[in-house]
Amino acid sequence: MVSFDRPVWAEIDLSAFRHNMRQIKSLLQPGTIFCPIIKADGYGHGAVPLAHEAVAMGAGYLGVAILDEAAALRAAGITLPILILGYTPPQAAAFVVSNHITQTIFSKEQADALSAAASNLGITVKVHVKVDTGMTRIGVRPEEAAAFCSYVAGLENVHLEGMFTHFASSDSADHAYCLEQFGRFTAAIAAVEASGIRLGIRHCANSAAILSLPEGHLDMVRAGIILYGLKPSDECPMPIDLRPVMRLKARLAMVKQVPPGVGVSYGSIYHTQKESSLATIPIGYADGYTRMLSRKAQVLLRGQRAPVVGRICMDQCMVDVSHVPQAAVGDEVLLFGGPDLPADEIAAHLGTINYEVVCMVGKRVPRVYVE
């Protein structure tokens, strides 16, 4: 199959990624395991290239959400321990075991399936028990943790390596609920260890907690959004310097002069008010530049902002460049990324978070890795 370079790309700055990793590690005590979270294709940045960078930078674990993500890393030659943070059906246990993947568990059915598969293969499988301290998602209740861990520890060919929880509001200025969750988790740890079980890796700190709850770092931290240079929230303190890793870019496909009163794009919801210069950008909602940004977003062209006019199409959108007379076909356009047009601005237009903005960038947008 012949593939041609699109005049649309997501520029991924590897030096920024490494810088962010160094900055985050500066907050940790010696011996704390650093676990980059590269689920959802590395938050849209490309899991495999960034996994290789993370390994080279001294990561001790990698975190993903689903089995397919772990499998892709193994297929790419990543040998570092990988923790699947989410649910994996018991029928996939043999694949988990044979690929030396660490699985999150919270039910006897999962644990039994992993034990059976590991016994059949003559391999010991590592597991981490998830404790639901207040996210109300997957996980055993804190008061169930000791009994469940005792059950798991008694299974053949299963190594109970760790236990963890996830904070629901560590990115909030009010840490009351986060501290309540942390208290429940530490109580669960104490109950488990009082039963004679030694938990090698206890972890609960996500990006926001890494920044604002040092007592929650424990044995391992899970760095997600901050690894990509984005803030967990506006309320979250930022004691380190982060650099955005992704910039979404394109090149102008056409520039045309349009008289007053002309409708633009589907539905003609926008009409030119005067003689205008309009440019077409070959990116649309199929690429993750969502239709919901129509008449809201701006792009950066030749150092100036240009508003999106009319509805964003599946593959193209239009901007008014009347105030940029030098605009020409082939000019580079920044759709988001960096300090001048941050992903947070796009998120604000959409009523969402920066996580979703970078994750929305579609598969047909090439990722171009730069230093």
Curated annotation (Swiss-Prot):
Annotated catalysed reactions: L-alanine = D-alanine
Protein origin, superkingdom: Bacteria
Active site positions: K39 (proton acceptor), Y266 (proton acceptor)
Molecular function in Gene Ontology: alanine racemase activity; pyridoxal phosphate binding
Entry keyword set: Isomerase, Pyridoxal phosphate
Pathway note: Amino-acid biosynthesis; D-alanine biosynthesis; D-alanine from L-alanine: step 1/1
Annotated CDD domains: PLPDE_III_AR
The UniProt record lists the keyword Repeat: no
GO biological process, one term: peptidoglycan biosynthetic process
Enzyme class: isomerase
N6-(pyridoxal phosphate)lysine modification, residue list: K39
EC numbers on record: 5.1.1.1
Annotated organism of origin: Desulfovibrio desulfuricans (strain ATCC 27774 / DSM 6949 / MB)
Cellular component annotations (GO), alphabetically ordered: cytosol
Family membership: Belongs to the alanine racemase family.
Cited function: Catalyzes the interconversion of L-alanine and D-alanine. May also act on other amino acids.
Pfam families cross-referenced by the UniProt entry: Ala_racemase_C (PF00842), Ala_racemase_N (PF01168)
HAMAP family assigned: Ala_racemase
Alphabetical list of NCBIfam families matching this protein: alr
Name of the protein in question: Alanine racemase
Cofactor needs: pyridoxal 5'-phosphate
Binding site for substrate: R137, M314
